């Protein structure tokens, strides 16, 4: 590059001693800058669409946008294209059959007006095959106190659920999901204890705000709303105040109920366990936690429990999309409004359409819902997952 730039200089200006303080010298140097930039862009820079450095720069630029937008959906779209490109002719049919029922998804996760990002999102299409059917895993985790419990849930919960489902008898989804959440909570608790006793792993300790040391670490927890989508059913497990909403024929159907301390049945359970609900900026367990169930939060046990409430919903031809989100969205956007926004974005893309517009529709819906929450002054992290459920309807019609 230096040689090219010197060639441009030699062609446009004869070499001669120049007084660096003179006005003419400054003018000549300024005149050279556009030429050097043009040469660098045209002769040195690699094609933009194949440039890894450009991708890294775009990631840095995007991370500086308001809310630190996490555009994981675009990455997944690129991965899908790459996966399709490397499929050889002999395995095209097999690959198409494997991925034919994978729903299109979009996800957005932003820090919002909070200082720290404590939300986490987990997306694992086709994480399990059972009875020759693909099962898909989606989860949103809203951490509090620190982010490491939510991050641990993102890394491990789908594996725990997979192992439990593989040994599940018939369709005992409620028992299976309760066991999975309890094991996740046990892993989090053991991890915290081992790190304190044996000396924490330094790399993780340095990256954690609470430094994974008691008593701060015992005050860390996370909500968890998880959905396992099969060709026939939608299983939702909820622990905390994140929420899952199904949009069916234009109607918003909540598939989970928020675990708030002042919910009558939760209030009775907390009081029977010997705890109290104190109203301090809203109802809180012992005046501290604004939810009655969560993974982690060892210092509030047995009042705060990790047991999820599980709903199993049969899929129908009228199902349009599933929305999973943290309370950063639901605190300011009603279920019906969220459903309407998602339907509006999906309307332009037909069910079963594999065009770029169809793949971007869910991403647009998640992004628009996030922007709406921020515009309505949401004060929390906002994480949204939108799953297009319409593909199954087209597959049935064509068969």
Swiss-Prot record:
Q: How is its activity regulated?
A: Repressed by PYR/PYL/RCAR ABA receptors in an ABA-dependent manner.
- Give the co-factor note: Binds 2 magnesium or manganese ions per subunit.
The keyword Cell membrane is assigned to this record: no
Q: Which residues bind Mn(2+) 1?
A: 142-143, 327, 331
GO biological process entries:
abscisic acid-activated signaling pathway; defense response to virus; negative regulation of abscisic acid-activated signaling pathway; negative regulation of anion channel activity; regulation of stomatal movement; response to abscisic acid; response to cold; response to water deprivation
Q: Would the keyword Metal-binding be found if you checked this record's keyword annotation?
A: yes
Kindly list the positions annotated as binding Zn(2+): 146, 148, 208, 210
- Hey, where's the site called Lock on this chain? 280
Cofactor(s) recorded for this entry are: Mg(2+); Mn(2+)
Question: In what way is this protein post-translationally modified?
Answer: Ubiquitinated by RGLG1 and RGLG5 in response to abscisic acid (ABA). Ubiquitination of PP2CA leads to its degradation by the proteasome.
Reaction catalyzed: O-phospho-L-seryl-[protein] + H2O = L-seryl-[protein] + phosphate; O-phospho-L-threonyl-[protein] + H2O = L-threonyl-[protein] + phosphate
Cite the SMART domains for this sequence.
PP2C_SIG, PP2Cc
Outline the inducing conditions.
Repressed by MYB44. Induced by cold stress, drought, high salt, and ABA.
Question: According to the lineage, what is the superkingdom?
Answer: Eukaryota
What GO molecular functions are on record for this protein? kinase binding; metal ion binding; phosphatase activity; phosphoprotein phosphatase activity; protein kinase binding; protein serine/threonine phosphatase activity
Using the record's annotation, list all stretches that form the PPM-type phosphatase domain. Answer: 104-389
One GO cellular component term noted in the UniProt record for this chain: cytosol
**Listed Pfam families:** PP2C (PF00481)
Family, per entry: Belongs to the PP2C family.
How does this chain assemble?
Interacts with AKT2/AKT3. Interacts with ABA-bounded PYR1, PYL1, PYL2, PYL3, PYL4, PYL9 and PYL12, and with free PYL2, PYL3, PYL4 and PYL13. Binds to and inactivates SLAC1 and SRK2E. The inactivation of SRK2E does not require phosphatase activity. Interacts with CBL1, CBL2, CBL3, CBL5, and CBL7, but not CBL4, CBL6, and CBL9. Interacts with RGLG1 and RGLG5. Interacts with KIN10.
According to UniProt, the name of this protein is: Protein phosphatase 2C 37
Q: Which gene encodes it?
A: PP2CA
């Amino acid at each position: 590059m230096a040689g090219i730039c010197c060639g441009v200089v030699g062609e446009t200006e004869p070499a001669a001693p120049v007084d660096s303080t003179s006005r003419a010298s400054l003018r000549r140097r300024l005149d050279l800058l556009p030429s050097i930039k043009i040469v660098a862009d045209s002769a040195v820079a690699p094609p933009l669409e194949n440039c890894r450095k450009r991708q890294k720069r775009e990631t840095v630029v995007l991370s500086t946008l308001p809310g630190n937008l996490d555009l994981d959906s675009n990455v997944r779209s690129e991965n899908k294209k790459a996966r399709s490109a490397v499929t050889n002719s002999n395995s095209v049919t097999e690959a198409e059959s494997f991925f034919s029922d994978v729903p299109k998804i979009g996800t957005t996760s932003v820090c919002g007006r909070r200082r720290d990002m404590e939300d986490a999102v987990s997306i694992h299409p086709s994480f399990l095959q059972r009875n020759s059917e693909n099962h898909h895993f989606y989860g949103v985790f809203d951490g509090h106190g620190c982010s490491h419990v939510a991050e641990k849930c993102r890394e491990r919960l789908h594996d725990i659920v997979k192992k439990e489902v593989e040994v599940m008898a018939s369709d005992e989804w409620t028992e299976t999901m309760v066991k999975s959440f309890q094991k996740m909570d046990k892993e989090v608790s053991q991890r915290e204890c081992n790190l304190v006793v044996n000396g924490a792993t330094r790399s993780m300790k340095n990256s954690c705000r609470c430094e994974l040391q008691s008593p701060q670490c015992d005050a860390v927890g996370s909500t968890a709303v998880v959905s396992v989508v099969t060709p026939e059913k939608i299983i939702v497990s909820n622990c905390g105040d994140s929420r899952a909403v199904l949009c069916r024929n234009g109607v918003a159907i909540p598939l989970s109920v928020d675990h708030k301390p002042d919910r009558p049945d939760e209030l009775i359970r907390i009081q029977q366990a010997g705890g109290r609900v104190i109203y301090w900026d809203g109802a809180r367990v012992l005046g501290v936690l604004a939810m009655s169930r969560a993974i982690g939060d060892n210092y509030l046990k047995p009042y705060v429990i990790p047991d999820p409430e599980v709903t199993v919903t049969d899929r129908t031809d009228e199902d349009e999309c599933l929305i999973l989100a943290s309370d950063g969205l639901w605190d300011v956007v009603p279920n019906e409004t969220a459903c309407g926004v998602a339907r509006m974005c999906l309307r332009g893309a037909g069910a079963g359409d594999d065009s770029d517009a169809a793949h971007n529709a869910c991403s647009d819906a998640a992004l628009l819902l996030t922007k709406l929450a921020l515009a309505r002054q949401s004060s929390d992290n906002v994480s949204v997952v939108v799953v297009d459920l319409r593909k199954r309807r087209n597959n049935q019609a064509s068969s």
